[in-house]
């Protein structure tokens, strides 16, 4: 038994508790779906109304932290002594592919409809004002602010991993400067790690819960195969198998090649939509939306709507900030891993500038296309959602484009590869966080990574069985609460240690 543990490298205190907790929650959910939905609604209401303001302040403070890194004393510090492991182009593509997935294609195609039909600031639904502000809010939720949060934590983890030469990558390992070695490696650190892992597992499950219906609806459109929960389960199984093949190739091949393919295909598909949908309108709408964003930015940053209580900031801004918070550590660990040898300023600028440009292009093109289809009465999104669900409405926004069959094939392949790259990045981090010893330059065990991807697939199926967007939103928001505090502790620990040990 001792030799087996040494071979697999599993750390029992952070490997088994998340398995047990997630297993119990899944069993309770499947046992009574109606009761689970009641609990989900109560949790969503409590967290968004009681803690929404904290998420908004957190994002603002982290933005100031990004400026401090870029222009402060650590800007020219190098994260490791080696040259960069990946070319700049592959580095940017890997970041883009790992931080986005079919879940992003999901929101990019439909988000603007929700903003227009239930707008903020007391605007009339479907009014001119609501349409003018629709894309601006997407640019806000998927712009520099959240990417700055990721870049700050990526610097922190790269510092601990490559500069301080820490052997284990998990949140508790970075807290030694803040709480001391006794607490970081004791019960407190174990609790922190388990909170992180449970939240991350459910976050990954929500991404699969959003991505899978898109693929199955594509299959129904292309092949006439009825969309069922069983088909969703088959698709998730295919993702896990393909992920295992990628992992067997190692991070260099298994991670970079699908990421590059996914990125090139993304821009190819977006270019097609841009050309055939209406390039002039898209550019005009984007330009106007940037102006709206700049005009409303202070209100957006601190909008909680405590008087009118319309629910927009709770349902969207708080939800998205929780989305970014819950993925921040996991993605920052992965991004730190592929950023060895780069300077702090290079990492911060590369992430914020490159990834903001990528997400802004995606949301502008897809959101503008959806708005045009609605205004021209080509598709009726409310009816599609009511009769068939959100995924069908999204598919119809793509099927309405010229050369619909070729377009749908491209979208189908893109969604499939996009989710493989996401599962690859997430399972890598889960395996790193639950192994006893993964030294600099080593990869976590193959079976551990595959095992985590299987568990995440089960979570995705459970969320799909619940139905609707609310369970997915609640899973993100509830998981974001404990990680909100963990992220703050990691940030403070990095600042404290860097001041003492990262001097000229």
Swiss-Prot record:
<dbReference type="GO" id="GO:0009437">
    <property type="term" value="P:carnitine metabolic process"/>
</dbReference>
<feature type="transmembrane region" description="Helical">
    <location>
        <begin position="51"/>
        <end position="71"/>
    </location>
</feature>
<comment type="subunit">
    <text>Homotrimer.</text>
</comment>
<feature type="transmembrane region" description="Helical">
    <location>
        <begin position="195"/>
        <end position="215"/>
    </location>
</feature>
<keyword id="KW-0997">Cell inner membrane</keyword>
<feature type="transmembrane region" description="Helical">
    <location>
        <begin position="10"/>
        <end position="30"/>
    </location>
</feature>
<dbReference type="GO" id="GO:0044667">
    <property type="term" value="F:(R)-carnitine:4-(trimethylammonio)butanoate antiporter activity"/>
</dbReference>
<feature type="transmembrane region" description="Helical">
    <location>
        <begin position="398"/>
        <end position="418"/>
    </location>
</feature>
<feature type="transmembrane region" description="Helical">
    <location>
        <begin position="143"/>
        <end position="163"/>
    </location>
</feature>
<protein>
    <recommendedName>
        <fullName>L-carnitine/gamma-butyrobetaine antiporter</fullName>
    </recommendedName>
</protein>
<keyword id="KW-0472">Membrane</keyword>
<comment type="function">
    <text>Catalyzes the exchange of L-carnitine for gamma-butyrobetaine.</text>
</comment>
<keyword id="KW-0050">Antiport</keyword>
<dbReference type="InterPro" id="IPR000060">
    <property type="entry name" value="BCCT_transptr"/>
</dbReference>
<keyword id="KW-1003">Cell membrane</keyword>
<comment type="similarity">
    <text>Belongs to the BCCT transporter (TC 2.A.15) family. CaiT subfamily.</text>
</comment>
<feature type="transmembrane region" description="Helical">
    <location>
        <begin position="316"/>
        <end position="336"/>
    </location>
</feature>
<feature type="transmembrane region" description="Helical">
    <location>
        <begin position="446"/>
        <end position="466"/>
    </location>
</feature>
<comment type="pathway">
    <text>Amine and polyamine metabolism; carnitine metabolism.</text>
</comment>
<feature type="transmembrane region" description="Helical">
    <location>
        <begin position="475"/>
        <end position="495"/>
    </location>
</feature>
<dbReference type="GO" id="GO:1900751">
    <property type="term" value="P:4-(trimethylammonio)butanoate transport"/>
</dbReference>
<feature type="transmembrane region" description="Helical">
    <location>
        <begin position="347"/>
        <end position="367"/>
    </location>
</feature>
<dbReference type="Pfam" id="PF02028">
    <property type="entry name" value="BCCT"/>
</dbReference>
<feature type="transmembrane region" description="Helical">
    <location>
        <begin position="92"/>
        <end position="112"/>
    </location>
</feature>
<feature type="transmembrane region" description="Helical">
    <location>
        <begin position="231"/>
        <end position="251"/>
    </location>
</feature>
<feature type="transmembrane region" description="Helical">
    <location>
        <begin position="263"/>
        <end position="283"/>
    </location>
</feature>
<keyword id="KW-1133">Transmembrane helix</keyword>
<dbReference type="InterPro" id="IPR018093">
    <property type="entry name" value="BCCT_CS"/>
</dbReference>
<dbReference type="InterPro" id="IPR023449">
    <property type="entry name" value="BCCT_transptr_CaiT"/>
</dbReference>
<dbReference type="GO" id="GO:0005886">
    <property type="term" value="C:plasma membrane"/>
</dbReference>
<keyword id="KW-0812">Transmembrane</keyword>
<keyword id="KW-0813">Transport</keyword>
């Amino acid at each position: 038994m001792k030799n087996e543990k040494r071979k697999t490298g599993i750390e029992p205190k952070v490997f088994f508790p998340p398995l047990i907790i997630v297993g119990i929650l899944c069993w309770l959910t499947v046992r009574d779906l109606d009761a689970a939905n009641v609990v989900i609604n109560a949790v969503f209401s409590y967290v968004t109304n009681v803690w929404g303001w904290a998420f908004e302040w957190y994002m603002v403070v982290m933005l100031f932290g990004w400026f401090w890194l870029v222009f402060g004393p650590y800007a020219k510090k190098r994260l490791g002594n080696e040259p960069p492991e990946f070319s700049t182009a592959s580095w940017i593509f890997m970041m883009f592919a790992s931080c986005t997935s079919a879940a992003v294609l999901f929101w990019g195609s439909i988000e603007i409809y929700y903003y227009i039909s239930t707008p903020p600031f007391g605007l009339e639904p479907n009014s001119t004002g609501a349409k003018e502000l629709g894309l601006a809010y997407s640019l806000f939720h998927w712009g520099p602010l959240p990417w700055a949060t990721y870049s700050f934590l990526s610097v922190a983890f790269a510092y601990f991993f490559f500069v301080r030469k820490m052997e284990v990558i998990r949140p508790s390992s970075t807290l030694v400067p803040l709480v001391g070695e006794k607490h970081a490696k004791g019960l407190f650190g174990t609790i922190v790690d388990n909170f992180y892992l449970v939240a991350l597992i459910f976050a990954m499950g929500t991404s699969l819960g959003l991505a899978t219906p898109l693929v199955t609806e594509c299959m129904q459109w292309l092949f006439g195969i009825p969309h069922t929960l069983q088909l969703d389960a088959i698709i998730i199984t295919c993702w896990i198998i393909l992920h295992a093949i990628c992992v067997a190739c190692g991070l260099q091949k298994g991670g970079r090649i699908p990421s590059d393919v996914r990125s090139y295909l993304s821009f190819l598909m977006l270019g097609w939509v841009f050309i055939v949908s209406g390039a002039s309108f898209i550019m005009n709408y984007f330009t106007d939306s940037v102006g709206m964003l700049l005009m409303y930015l202070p209100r957006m940053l601190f909008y909680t709507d405590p008087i009118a209580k319309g629910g927009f900031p709770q349902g969207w801004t708080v939800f998205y900030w929780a989305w970014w918070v819950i993925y921040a550590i996991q993605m920052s660990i992965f991004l730190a891993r592929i950023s060895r040898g780069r300077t702090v300023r290079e990492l911060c600028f590369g992430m914020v500038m490159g990834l903001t440009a990528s997400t802004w292009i995606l949301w502008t093109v897809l959101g503008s296309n959806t708005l045009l289809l609605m205004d021209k009465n080509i598709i009726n999104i409310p009816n599609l959602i009511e009769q068939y669900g959100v995924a069908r409405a999204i598919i119809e926004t793509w099927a309405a484009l010229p050369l619909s069959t070729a377009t749908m094939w491209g979208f189908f392949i893109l969604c499939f590869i996009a989710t493989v790259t996401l599962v690859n990045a997430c399972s890598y981090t889960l395996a790193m966080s639950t192994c006893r010893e993964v030294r600099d330059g080593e990869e976590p065990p193959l079976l551990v990574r595959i095992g985590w991807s299987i568990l995440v697939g089960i979570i995705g199926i459970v969320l799909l069985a619940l139905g609707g967007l609310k369970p997915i939103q609640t899973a993100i928001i509830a998981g974001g609460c404990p990680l909100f505090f963990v992220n703050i502790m990691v940030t403070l620990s990095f600042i404290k240690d860097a001041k003492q040990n990262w001097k000229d």
